[in-house]
């Protein structure tokens, strides 16, 4: 989800974040060549196999390449945040709603068909929340640059999570089907709209899994 963004400034310079988090400014000193203001570090823009590639003079062993929209960090992080927030809200809303109805001694008023759809929707949400939670626990050490925990002894865990992506796909399919069925019931507009949001959140989890290569069939991590 992390990417290096190079920004073009109005005065013709470009800016890029440094390892410290500060922004460094570069001024063009030649064709497709920029030098750091007040320094000697340079960035050179070339093309490799038709892809725009930036070479850093202080890190020549790695390059920066223009990523497609599907791999945009801003897009995918937005999808992840939307999906996680929506699913957590859905997960918390159901017990809270039940408690409020119990306090008011009221019933949901939903028919058997609508209750079955809600049950299926809840099951799909639980599956995806567990799926995201498991991946977060596994990836958390990497976010802290603690790569020592990734050994062959956890290969089975990684493989299990990769295969569990099929459950996330099934949950998304169930969520879309529930939203489609909800639209053809006497449920309130709010309920139907919420079903669509939940379906989009479930699809968002699949999107993140596919783009992030969490749903794969190998142990190259």
Write out the residue ranges for each language-model feature.
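Peripheral terminal and inter-domain segments
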Residues: 1-221
């Amino acid at each position: 989800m992390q990417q290096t963004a190079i920004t073009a400034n109005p005065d013709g310079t470009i800016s890029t974040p440094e390892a410290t988090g500060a922004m460094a400014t570069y001024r063009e000193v030649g064709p497709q060549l920029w030098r750091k203001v007040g320094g000697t570090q340079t960035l050179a823009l070339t093309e490799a196999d038709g892809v725009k590639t930036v070479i850093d003079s202080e890190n020549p062993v790695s390059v920066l390449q223009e990523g497609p929209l599907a791999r945009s960090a801003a897009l995918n992080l937005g999808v992840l945040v939307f999906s996680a927030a929506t699913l957590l809200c859905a997960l918390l809303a159901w017990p809270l709603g039940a408690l409020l109805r119990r306090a008011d001694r009221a019933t949901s008023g939903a028919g058997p068909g609508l209750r079955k759809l809600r049950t299926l929707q809840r099951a799909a949400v639980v599956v995806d929340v567990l799926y995201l939670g498991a991946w977060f626990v596994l990836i958390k050490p990497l976010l802290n640059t603690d790569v020592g925990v990734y050994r062959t002894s956890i290969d089975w865990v990684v493989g299990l999570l990769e295969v569990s992506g099929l459950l996330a796909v099934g949950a998304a399919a169930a969520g879309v089907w529930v939203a489609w069925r909800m639209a053809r019931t006497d449920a309130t507009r709010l309920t139907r709209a919420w079903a669509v949001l939940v379906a989009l959140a479930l699809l968002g989890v699949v999107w993140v899994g596919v783009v992030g290569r969490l749903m794969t069939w190998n142990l190259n991590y």
